[in-house]
């Protein structure tokens, strides 16, 4: 076997007949498979042991030679070579075809490669190959032309006219092979290149296509005639197995049936040719053989597919590769692994951040080899076999050994669907009773897991390296931040939030208010003995609390609550005392208003201070982020565990319950509803009188009900009582939101009909009052639509993620600095008045490209090529700087990846990104994972704001990444200049906008309903939109440059996600958009040897021109091309990656003709061939590290040890 980690690239080509015979271990001459009586393979049949190897390890067919002793000997009785049975997966056979047969991939593909090579139409080829017409191969002296088609009748007429032997014309693939052999590639290419200089239009396109194919053959060293087969390879039998079922029947792979048809027809053809049968019979048999081979290679590509039992089309060789069930996606990219298990998950509230509970039964099976080795090592079992028996009997001493084996051996937990890298994390196993895996409650958010029956898979890293990697890189305690936005992903939820909220509540006049304590311990004693309540406002001496107080806060008394003293006791030292949920308190210090002098009257002080709101979920997230910023991973995960324990403990003590009496009643609800009814009546009257259109009426009515619902909601918020359990759950962020609350206590409001339109009849009741039958019926519409939408959305979002991963999987951080001199100018992203993404968020964690100066003083805030920290970003914003030039992925010069400086920090760690980080995959996951949170709908605004439907949500994201023409397209100006006039034309209901540039004037026609974005006299740059809508990016690319398009697309993606409340770091979107603009289309090839119209990678294009310029030749010119992500994935340089994505046969056909070489730069192609991936620790620079000279002198160490032993 080849060591897969040693080879550097993989090449594909067309197999020559000699090569096929060289691969083969013998010819398959008979269609037989196995003998039905002896169950042994037939000789010279499809399962022959002499050709394909023995069925049993180290044993020949007749059983004369048995054992490894006879390795590689050939038995003289049965002729089988003694070797392993695995050779039946590797050894090929062949069939010598009685007539040449065309390969359907090259004849049928689009464009037909055979047709281009011969300059014949695919239709003409089909007529010749399937024996409908003759083709003239050599016209000799006659007036026929080479490659001319003749029907049977014309052929006979020409023979009569010119006499036998006066010209050569043939039928079938044989004729095509002769023609292909006649093609002189070099001569053809030279002639076509000459012709290319003069022609235009369709002819030019055709010549470029032909040149493309011919030069591909010339470069790759494939011969044109190899597209026609003389020998057919037979794949190894274990890849097309035949297995016996219980009833003595056999189940077999479809390929065996297809091969049998080929062999039968081939043998019949041989016999007919030996008998000198009439030509017409032989021709028919040849045609049948051609069809049989076509079906074997690609069933259904031509004509009706051949079906097996039950009208099911047979799976041909091509189908074995294609699709989700094909070889690529099912077996190469989606292998099942040993040392794994799955079970239902249950909550493990007592676990630490880095632990998970593993059922003993599961662990004993997973760790079996380790336990067995340990049993032998500890001499509890004589040998491995005895140890195995012990483990299977589950002897008592096995469990003790298991405890030691499991200790500090991390396991991986994975929950499907794995939408981002946090869907697989490492934990240290803790053995537990029961059968469910226990999961830490804080890890749920990353997995999107809950305990309503979810299952998770567990995997065991085996090697030392794998364990080290799992522990250092994948341990759950390390994954505090979410890679998509750098915010904490492990935030407390539900009970934990509720407990901490309850703990930090304040109430006036609770028992023991105004007591002053010396230490936190005193506070706790007082609380336990019932002198004070958790919510009681008290005073405590600041010096007893180990916190960073300011000068004038020391030796004073802090006014706080009992609960907050407890809450602050778990916060890491060095953090301010948190007394109110504000950022100032969190980042700098406690507010001075909460302090009093020792002699002051605390009752008076308390009267002057309002009660402070408790700490909600969002604020707990801010605390975690701040702790992480200051103390990094370990301290944060310890704090998180303390926060979790405290939250659970306090919510248990609080014991919140919910009863119907807890749902408040809005006193004047009926007044609000009556007013709405009256308003609707007025609107209907106006409509009846013809004052408003039906659309306007509909919008007004739905508007009225929306307002009614909102005013009820407002009333509820104003009157809410913070001690109400439902309000506490909602306000704290533990469960539910205002909309759920208003459905319980206000009104349910408007519902969507099945067609997605909102119904005018609202549901006036709420759940407390109960719904009428009709209202219940209406509300089921909305509920069902919600369910179906979610299901559809999940599938759509998953497919989007798959395409994104495919296009960016080879983007890896490859070097420290690419040394580019270009940058990206960034500012706030806003739509009209609404802020989408502020400059501050775009700056943090990026490198500058130019120094930033203070606009007023002119002093330098930060130099060139420096990392912008949060503090510096804050300074830049405070200095009122509007634009900053930063290093960006868009302008990075690193080929096949990005450099550290252009990428910035790794959002998941908050530190500089490391070389080897697979940023492409992370970017794809970051964009794809929140895809399910985006809406599905394209909004029908019902003719209010604009006539066009604005696409939003998931469809808009797809539209952007697939570079489609957007719905509701905005017209852009192609010249820079002044808007000279906007003229309305009442007759055609249009407006004409005239833009006057320096050299030319353009006018654009827009509809009356379109919202204008420009006004008369305004100066605009080319590419600026004239009306509201989405710009078509391909058009923008023609008018402006690539960087403008990239910037526009980045803004559009951010708008779509942020409008739904999803935050994603710019850099992820930059990575994806850069992949869409990686290619250049050659416009003029200069003196290089590329063809005009070729697509090239930017880096290859630059290298090509560099060489041309160094040799003093004319460089090629090209223009950037914007490709959708699907097309970009298929245009990748790696044929393995492209073939495993989509259109497998097309990709492979093309790659074979070009003799493409895959340099295995991406992740996917390495996974396919089973090589370690070139990212992270698998990167070349990390794998070949020579250890430094042995610094410790080993013998000396040993001597010291022996001395201590003796002493």
From Swiss-Prot:
Residue sites binding Zn(2+) 2 per the record: 818, 892, 899, 902
GO annotation terms (biological process): DNA-templated transcription
SUPFAM superfamilies: beta and beta-prime subunits of DNA dependent RNA-polymerase
Required cofactor(s): Mg(2+); Zn(2+)
TM segment ranges: none
SMART domains in UniProt: RPOLA_N
Keyword annotations from UniProtKB, A to Z: DNA-directed RNA polymerase, Magnesium, Metal-binding, Nucleotidyltransferase, Transcription, Transferase, Zinc
Catalytic activity: RNA(n) + a ribonucleoside 5'-triphosphate = RNA(n+1) + diphosphate
EC number: 2.7.7.6
Cofactor mode of binding and number, as noted: Binds 1 Mg(2+) ion per subunit. Binds 2 Zn(2+) ions per subunit.
Taxonomy, superkingdom: Bacteria
Tagged with keyword Magnesium: yes
Binding site for Zn(2+) 1: 60, 62, 75, 78
Molecular function GO labels: DNA binding; DNA-directed RNA polymerase activity; magnesium ion binding; zinc ion binding
One Pfam family it belongs to: RNA_pol_Rpb1_5
GO CC entries: DNA-directed RNA polymerase complex
Family: Belongs to the RNA polymerase beta' chain family.
HAMAP family: RNApol_bact_RpoC
PANTHER family listed in its UniProt record: DNA-DIRECTED RNA POLYMERASE (PTHR19376), DNA-DIRECTED RNA POLYMERASE SUBUNIT BETA (PTHR19376:SF54)
Role played: DNA-dependent RNA polymerase catalyzes the transcription of DNA into RNA using the four ribonucleoside triphosphates as substrates.
Stated name of the protein: DNA-directed RNA polymerase subunit beta'
Species of the source: Lactococcus lactis subsp. cremoris (strain MG1363)
